[in-house]
Amino acid sequence: MNFKFARFKSIFNILFILIIAFPGGLIYLLTGSTLSFWLRESDFDKITIGLFGLVNFIHIFKFLWGPLLEKISFSTLSNRGYKYCLVITLINCIFCVYVLTSFNPNTNFIPFVLCLVVLAFFSSIYDMLIQSSQMLLITDKNWGISEAACTTGFRIGILISGSGALYLSTIISWQDVYRTMAILCIPSLLLIIFYPLKFKDKIIDNDFDRFLNAFYDFIKKPKCIVIISFMLLYRLQDSFLSIMPNMFYLDIGYTKQDLAVGYKAFGMCATIFGGVIGGFLCRKYEYSYLLKRVLIYHALSSLSFIYLYFLNQDITSLYIAVFCQEFTKGLTMSPFFSYQLKCCSSRYCITQIALITSITNVGTILIGSISGYAATYLGWSYFFIVAGLCFIPAYILILYLPKTINSV
């Protein structure tokens, strides 16, 4: 009887993670890819649009407030403290999205950018809380599945704020589109408020020494420098591409309606499918083997951009190219994020997850911010060739990753 109860509890926790990941994905695109379409229609050039990626630079520093979150979340309030953090953070995200709609990027440039930065700040906190919830609620043998669920929820959010927002923008203004996205976050907020959280382990009260202990615990792991370098470079290809595929598809003649269905909606389904397959593969294959294989598959997907550019630009070709790109992207995510969790200790989960994702975001944000320059001066063909070669540094580092990691 206890076994059946534990099994149902695990399933409900995984579903909870899926649903609370939805606003994270939805908000993610509102400061990224979807924003680029709004800026493009406001007559900003590729270089400026690429530089807008720097509003997410604050994600790099989220490891600094990770210990503070642990202090608040894992105090004597325990489960309630963690829930309060989730609720307050999501409310602030919704509020910032709504305030953003009060500004025009052309006439209110500085307030517009500042509001985006504040939104990115609260979004980074929410992402930390989502990721750490997997470690706190899910047993380690189910991390691959929980990450697939988290990726699925995140990607559904991206689907709504990507395909849905793009389609809505053909009917209503971008300001109204963003207001609609803010409203769609409310059901997840209500679930967080009413869902009974219960951690799998007893959480130890925090003190300031844990700030340093969390970093020391991570640094003393075998081959720490290799792990950090790997985290920094694994998603180099996606970082280099950044939001430029949006501009590419528009430049070669596809309409927003084509992209809403063929790129955003279909592409998101392909990414989710890839994420689910990747999650189950995590249970079957050893990490280094799987990470190498999916990295190569994703690198080869860059050929689909070149195919579209030189050979064929019809709707069928768009679907084929998008499937190659997005399925392999999803395939890389589950093993990568599961490996991130494996590198963390449960007693310092928020701080260490924040540290790891901050390292990952350094490459994503800094490299992504120059993608506009690269696309402008290299041209589309050479731009995608360089993107395809970006897998090489991470592939080499995988060969030197430690075989075992202490994540207690």
Curated annotation (Swiss-Prot):
CDD domains: MFS_AmpG_like (cd17486). Pfam families: MFS_1. GO terms for cellular component: plasma membrane. It is a multi-pass membrane protein. The chain crosses the membrane at residues 11-31, 49-69, 84-104, 110-130, 154-174, 177-197, 224-244, 261-281, 294-311, 353-373, 382-402. GO terms for molecular function: transmembrane transporter activity. Keywords: Cell inner membrane, Cell membrane, Membrane, Transmembrane, Transmembrane helix, Transport. The keyword tRNA-binding does not apply. SUPFAM superfamilies: MFS general substrate transporter (SSF103473). It is found in: Cell inner membrane. This is Putative transporter AmpG 2. It comes from Rickettsia prowazekii (strain Madrid E).
